[in-house]
């Protein structure tokens, strides 16, 4: 018997394993479920090895879209998705996704092939200083020096991506490592890293925050995507209802408390921000999205209570009255404890609530009037009114564009947390289809039956439109709505277009924001086997969307034509719309 064991041990000591398989096993050990990428030399074997272990590999048409998809998986699941890219240009294409993940604080792992070690500084194929280049866009960027170190580096990258403020990490894999063989007994896989530690705010600071809130006459809660990521929906909703507090979600904070909740004051956004005397920030940064917390968008003496997981974020742009460093859900529960001990409410019949309700009613009436217009082509409000009428309550909404995203945000409701993905903190165009693919995969595995509605401006669709083939290849029942105004911000109708081109060439005549009028984007979908609809009227929109929602077997694209000069309703403040056009 001892001789048999010795023989088995001897056999195992001679067993070899490739670098590709070590990478795949190390990722599997860290509970990585999804990998997106564009394969080629030298990373194809890594994708194949990952599939052998049950990691889902989704081949995309561009590294940028692959990186966007992987980062969205990180946000939706709390575990990083992996983006696999080839060396040099392949990695460069992924930098946009890495930067976007870091700016949005989403966990992401990028694995990039690189030139062989023995060819360094010789002008090797696609040679580039990749580790150094990625440091600007990541929390951690490293290259294992041996195959044996790969599991250590992968565990550290996964842990770094989810601990503290989440973000992107990069792992550089030399081409010769992929096929290089190592003794199987020399590889020591690291245990799956533990979930991120949950930190709580100082008790004295929590008491101070509760005291400031009790003294408020015009309180406001702002719910950011940090609250969504920390799964704080139950605690924040309880706080909202128990204290009768008005709340305003940021774009990806929508759904933490449902948009149709009576305490949601999204329709009175500007008035709420400008008039509040105490504002509690739940995982929301005072960046451009919230106008930096400064006048004239806010009162000069407004008091901020800032809750964030990242200490460096506290106090940016304004000095908070109270800072609460910790996990958003944990700190929300700490605040609830204070109001459980000594109940308090913002009076529902207060002048503050009356002011907000009046402004909401006024703004909603304007939007309703715009939505009810019968003229053709349709305007944005008419389109989104009819979409909202049929939108399933549990839908994932992915949105990008200019007016398409801004108006859609106000009219398309989210009722569940982590069910809205958009251009985010970085204002990134081109994310839409990658995000939609990620959401569809996560929905399929974790919440079967939930639909993904991807709402794109026609310009935004152009950034990653070829990912329609990816959607069809994996048969993801995504519904794409391309809101088509023939341009970036605004375009021209076909008659005006023809007149412009009659006397001069397009390069000197066509305004920079114009796109080809009446482009049939729905044919991109039908070319790959999905369903496409060319929509001009409310009746056609209702019919085609109803059919798309009923058919769960194929992806669909609705190309919705609107008035080329359609725009937003008049705004109290011109937010990102300063232009002389």
Curated annotation (Swiss-Prot):
Residues reported to bind Mg(2+): 458, 485
Pathway the protein acts in: Lipid metabolism; fatty acid metabolism
Subcellular location: Peroxisome
The keyword Lyase belongs to this UniProt entry's keyword annotation: yes
Gene3D superfamilies membership: 3.40.50.970, TPP-binding domain
This protein's GO CC annotations: nucleoplasm; peroxisome
Ranges where the record places region Thiamine pyrophosphate binding: 404-487
SUPFAM superfamilies membership: DHS-like NAD/FAD-binding domain (SSF52467), Thiamin diphosphate-binding fold (THDP-binding) (SSF52518)
Annotated residues for binding of thiamine diphosphate: 63
One Pfam family per UniProt: TPP_enzyme_C
InterPro entries, sorted: DHS-like_NAD/FAD-binding_dom, HACL1-like, THDP-binding, Thiamin_PyroP_enz_cen_dom, Thiamin_PyroP_enz_TPP-bd_dom, TPP_enzyme_TPP-bd
UniProt keyword annotation of Zinc-finger present: no
Disruption phenotype: Mice are viable and fertile and show no abnormal phenotype. However, upon dietary administration of phytol, phytanic acid accumulated in tissues, mainly in liver and serum of deficient mice. As a consequence of phytanic acid (or a metabolite) toxicity, deficent mice display a significant weight loss, absence of abdominal white adipose tissue, enlarged and mottled liver and reduced hepatic glycogen and triglyceride. The presence of an other lyase, probably HCL2, can partially compensate for the loss of HCL1.
Residues bearing PTM N6-succinyllysine: 354, 361, 368
UniProt motif (Microbody targeting signal) ranges: 579-581
Cofactor(s) the protein requires to work: Mg(2+); thiamine diphosphate
Phosphoserine modification, residue list: 4, 6
Tissue: Predominanly expressed in liver.
Enzyme Commission numbers on file: 4.1.2.63
UniProt catalytic activity: a 2-hydroxy-3-methyl fatty acyl-CoA = a 2-methyl-branched fatty aldehyde + formyl-CoA; an (R)-2-hydroxy-long-chain-fatty acyl-CoA = a long-chain fatty aldehyde + formyl-CoA; 2-hydroxy-3-methylhexadecanoyl-CoA = 2-methylpentadecanal + formyl-CoA; 2-hydroxyoctadecanoyl-CoA = heptadecanal + formyl-CoA
GO function term, MF aspect, one: 2-hydroxyphytanoyl-CoA lyase activity
GO biological process assignments: fatty acid alpha-oxidation; lipid metabolic process; methyl-branched fatty acid metabolic process; phytanic acid metabolic process; protein targeting to peroxisome
The family this protein is said to belong to: Belongs to the TPP enzyme family.
Subunit structure: Homotetramer.
Name of the molecule in the record: 2-hydroxyacyl-CoA lyase 1
Gene expressing this chain: Hacl1
């Amino acid at each position: 018997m001892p001789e048999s064991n010795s023989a088995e041990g001897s056999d195992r000591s001679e067993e070899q394993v490739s670098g590709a398989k070590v990478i795949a096993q190390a990722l599997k050990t860290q509970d990585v479920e999804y990998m997106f990428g564009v394969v080629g030399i030298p990373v194809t074997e890594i994708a194949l090895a990952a599939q052998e272990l049950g990691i889902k590999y989704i081949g995309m048409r561009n590294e940028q879209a692959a990186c966007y998809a992987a980062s969205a998986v990180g946000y939706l699941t709390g575990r990083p998705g992996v983006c696999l890219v080839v060396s040099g240009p392949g990695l460069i294409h992924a930098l946009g996704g890495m930067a976007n993940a870091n700016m949005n604080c989403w966990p992401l792992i990028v694995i990039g092939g690189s030139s062989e070690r023995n060819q360094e500084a010789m002008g090797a194929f696609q040679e580039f200083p990749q580790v150094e280049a990625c440091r600007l866009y990541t929390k951690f960027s490293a290259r294992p020096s041996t195959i044996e170190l790969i599991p250590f580096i992968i565990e550290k990258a996964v842990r770094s991506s989810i601990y503290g403020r989440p973000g992107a990490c990069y792992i550089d894999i030399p081409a010769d490592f992929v096929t290089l063989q190592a003794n199987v007994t020399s590889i020591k896989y690291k245990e799956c890293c533990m979930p991120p530690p949950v930190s709580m705010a100082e008790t004295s600071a929590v008491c101070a925050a509760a005291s400031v809130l009790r003294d408020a006459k015009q309180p406001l809660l702002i719910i950011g995507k940090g609250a969504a990521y920390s799964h704080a929906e139950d605690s924040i909703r309880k706080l909202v209802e128990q204290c009768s507090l008005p709340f305003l979600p940021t774009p990806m904070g929508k759904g933490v408390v449902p948009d149709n909740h009576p305490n949601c004051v999204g329709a009175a956004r500007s008035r709420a921000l400008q008039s509040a005397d105490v504002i509690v920030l739940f995982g929301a940064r005072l960046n451009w999205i919230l106008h930096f917390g400064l006048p004239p968008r806010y009162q000069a003496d407004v008091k901020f209570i800032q809750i964030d997981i990242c200490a460096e974020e506290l106090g940016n742009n304004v000095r908070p009255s109270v800072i609460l460093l910790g996990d958003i859900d944990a700190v929300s529960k700490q605040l609830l404890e204070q109001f459980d001990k000594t109940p308090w409410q913002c009076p529902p019949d207060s002048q503050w609530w009356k002011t907000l309700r009046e402004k909401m009613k006024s703004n909603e009436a304007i939007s309703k009037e715009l939505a009810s217009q019968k003229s053709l082509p349709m305007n944005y409000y008419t389109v989104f009114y009819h979409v909202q009428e049929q939108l399933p309550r549990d839908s994932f909404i992915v949105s990008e564009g200019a007016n398409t995203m801004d108006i859609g945000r106000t009219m398309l409701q989210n009722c569940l947390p982590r069910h809205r993905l958009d251009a985010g903190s970085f204002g990134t165009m081109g994310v839409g289809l990658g995000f939609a693919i990620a959401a569809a995969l996560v929905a399929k595995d974790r919440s079967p039956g939930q639909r993904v509605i991807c709402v794109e401006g026609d310009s935004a669709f152009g950034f990653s439109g070829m990912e329609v083939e990816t959607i069809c290849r994996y048969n993801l029942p995504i519904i794409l709505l391309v809101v088509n105004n023939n341009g970036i911000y605004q375009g021209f109708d076909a008659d005006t277009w023809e007149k412009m081109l009659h006397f001069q060439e397009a390069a000197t005549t066509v305004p920079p924001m114009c796109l080809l009028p009446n482009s049939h984007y729905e044919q991109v979908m039908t070319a790959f086997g999905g369903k496409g609809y060319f929509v001009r009227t409310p009746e056609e929109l209702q019919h085609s969307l109803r059919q798309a929602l009923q058919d769960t077997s194929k992806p669909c694209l609705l190309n919705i034509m609107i008035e080329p000069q359609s725009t937003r309703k008049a705004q109290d403040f011109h937010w990102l719309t300063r232009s002389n056009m």
